UniProtKB/Swiss-Prot annotation:
Name of the protein in question: DNA translocase FtsK
Residues noted as binding ATP in the record, renumbered to the chain: 535-540
Taxonomic lineage of the native organism: Bacteria, Pseudomonadati, Pseudomonadota, Alphaproteobacteria, Hyphomicrobiales
Region of interest (Disordered), ranges: 794-823
InterPro entries cross-referenced by the UniProt entry: AAA+_ATPase, FtsK/SpoIIIE/SftA, FtsK_4TM, FtsK_alpha, FtsK_dom, Ftsk_gamma, P-loop_NTPase, WH-like_DNA-bd_sf
Sorted UniProt keywords: ATP-binding, Cell cycle, Cell division, Cell inner membrane, Cell membrane, Chromosome partition, DNA-binding, Membrane, Nucleotide-binding, Transmembrane, Transmembrane helix
GO MF term set: ATP binding; ATP hydrolysis activity; DNA binding
Transmembrane segments: 30-50, 81-101, 113-133, 141-161, 164-184
Subcellular location: Cell inner membrane
Physiological role: Essential cell division protein that coordinates cell division and chromosome segregation. The N-terminus is involved in assembly of the cell-division machinery. The C-terminus functions as a DNA motor that moves dsDNA in an ATP-dependent manner towards the dif recombination site, which is located within the replication terminus region. Translocation stops specifically at Xer-dif sites, where FtsK interacts with the Xer recombinase, allowing activation of chromosome unlinking by recombination. FtsK orienting polar sequences (KOPS) guide the direction of DNA translocation.
Amino acid sequence: MRSGASAPLAMTDTGHGIQAFARRQVGRLVGAGMFLAVAFGVASLATWNVADPSFSHATNNTVTNAMGYAGAVFSDLAMQFFGLAAVAALVPAVIWGYLLFSARGVDRLPKRGLFWFGFALLAAAIAGCIVPPKTWPLPTGLGGVFGDMVLKIPGVLIGGYPTGLIASVLAVLLAGPTLWLFAFGSALIGRKNGFAVMEEPAAADPREDDLLFDNEEDEGDEGILALGAITHWWLSLRAWMHRRAVRRRQERDEYEPEMEPRASAWRRAAERVESAEFAEQRMSPGGRARVEPEFFAAMVNDRSVSVDPDDDDIFDRDDEDMDFDDEPVAQRRAAPAAKVQQFRSDAATRVEAPAPRPAPGARVQREAQTSLIGSDKFEMPSLHFLSEPKNVARDPSLSKDALEQNARLLEGVLEDFGVKGEIIAVRPGPVVTLYELEPAPGIKSSRVIGLSDDIARSMSAIACRVAVVPGRNAIGIELPNAKRETVYLREIMASRDFETTKAKLALALGKTINGEAVIVDIAKMPHVLVAGTTGSGKSVAINTMILSLLYRLTPQECRLIMIDPKMLELSVYDGIPHLLTPVVTDPKKAVVALKWTVREMEDRYRKMSKVGVRNIDGFNARVQLAEKKGEKISRTVQTGFDRQTGEAIYETEDLDLEPMPYIVVIIDEMADLMMVAGKDIEGAVQRLAQMARAAGIHVIMATQRPSVDVITGTIKANFPTRISFQVTSKIDSRTILGEQGAEQLLGMGDMLYMAGGGRIQRVHGPFVSDDEVEKIVGHLKLQGVPEYLDAITEDDDEDDDEPSGKGAGSGGGGGGNFEDSDDPYDQAVAVVLRDGKASTSYIQRRLGIGYNRAASIIEKMEKEGIVGPANHAGKREILVPTEDDKF
């Protein structure tokens, strides 16, 4: 006998006697052991629970398997690798056990074991062709990992996982080889005497060995011939189908004109639809598509099989059924689109529904009922002054099927540029639709962001903005809708969110991509920098911010200072009671107004320090509480020391304070102001931006020239909240936001809102017309006359802080001209009485004299009783009335 052959396990030529008896008993023991092993496997598989602890599932749950932890591990491994075919894989073990227990034996163990394993693989593949039910808990198919591995091979040939009719045909084709492998692996065929009891020969016959050798070769040749015949039949069938596809394409080209430029993208979309139908049918209970094993993922994903969208039915038709003359060309062109639209029609899980319209608040119902009783109080503007949103029919391009189709097409475009990934969510909105891309491992975000122009061109879109979604492993691709919806200010003003917001200075900014209302608080920002080109919606956004304040706050709660060098945008608000001064149009007076605002900020801080509060809200609450109780706010201050005892002298000072309103400074065009007085403007804006928040003073600054000479680094550092409308270049976008993206906006109110911390959000600003603004302004003018402060634009204190030196200019007030007096002492007394400051260094700076002479003058003033002695801090009290005290 040749060395490669294996003798039967229990029937070897050992002769009669004790040795043969022992071999038979060992065979029976092995057969009984196989019966027990099969019983263990069947019981384990019958009580298999995916939640049991195993090698692939670490948990502290109690084992529910009938065979304990060992049964849970075995059943989990068997179901993971073979699926339902694990039960069929145990059948050959039963037959082996029967043959061994009955002393018939199993010859050629290695070969039959290999065929047994092959039978298990094909059985798993046949099980994988069956569509799993929704309750199937594993990410693989019914054939397990091995079944999916085998199905990957025909999947490469046909361009996707076998589904439907193809899967049925493939299962039938695999049935023959599977039965043959089962029969040979189970020792049902290829045995010398079948199931007959083999009699032990009396002596070894050399001719019998030769006969067995020949039989083995014949059996091996039969197996090879069978496999060769099956392979030849399969290749012939595939070649026939390929020839039919080529012939159909040639016949279609004779009647159909040249395909559109986007036909290649449609073909790729149809190909992905074909390959995804199998995944669509295999959905787990949680709604997530099954995850295919990674063994052949690279092989399938990297394939370059060209699938024509009209070749879907080549396996179902004969040549006689194909009549291109009777079928219109338009219908054949529409076939890919129809198939893509039909895909996921029932389970479009990644397409989210748009946000509902904001719920109306109670104010709408109150204003709907006209009051017959007049009121002397300040009456807020009515919502009826604003235009109602129009009930526009929903854009059909935003249906689930259309959005799913666009998502598939976008995946194809990204794949063309070498970006692999999956669109995991689609969020439609009033203006744009957000497609969230989950890139494959190794794909850089910067690479995808740099493809924004190419994506817009390939998708036939006006613009495309690409940005990373914060806090998620996704990249957002924003594409404009075919039909843009208009966001109306009334829709946000009348919403319950705007009415019930706790924001002190609420601004109706617009809507997000999903259609949700965006309401921000300028008191927390605390300042806003707005930039954008002409026509981008910047001025309309300024109007919506102003109207947001006018609809919620009275003149006692909020006052406005408007600076409009263009003399067009904000002049319509001139005369409303909320203004502290008429709309400033002169750039020089704008500088004076900003300096007054700085002085007002400092004065407010002095008042708050006297009361002992830290912000305007605490100050107003303290004053209102005192008014409610009928008390006066007072404080105890140290006025000096007793000359005899040296003890400190304290006095009680009554403070006559009133609640302070918020002040919002609105600068419509910063570029014009920077051209006239850049340093003064920048210094005043810097001080306001750094310190004015606690004083209740906030700045809204807009510019249409977002360059570095207008938006300097100092201004950017103190304006953490910025809004960018459409700009002309990436450089301008980086100047405003620190990153690109604003150049891809659509204009007409489309903006990027960057809150503190660098979080950027795309917002669609509401629209308000000039007629609506004029109606609201006309109503406000009827409520009262504005109380202007002339000091805001008066330039009488411009040179107060400049050192005069010798021959300095006029000091203003009652100080007169120092050059008119030759005595420095008289000049020093005039300075002290006018400015209320008495110190050696101050006199030295104001008169331009030396330190020793200034010290002598201060000592002379002390002797004459004009100033008091210096305290522990070096400050002196002025004992005679100053000019401020006279008035």
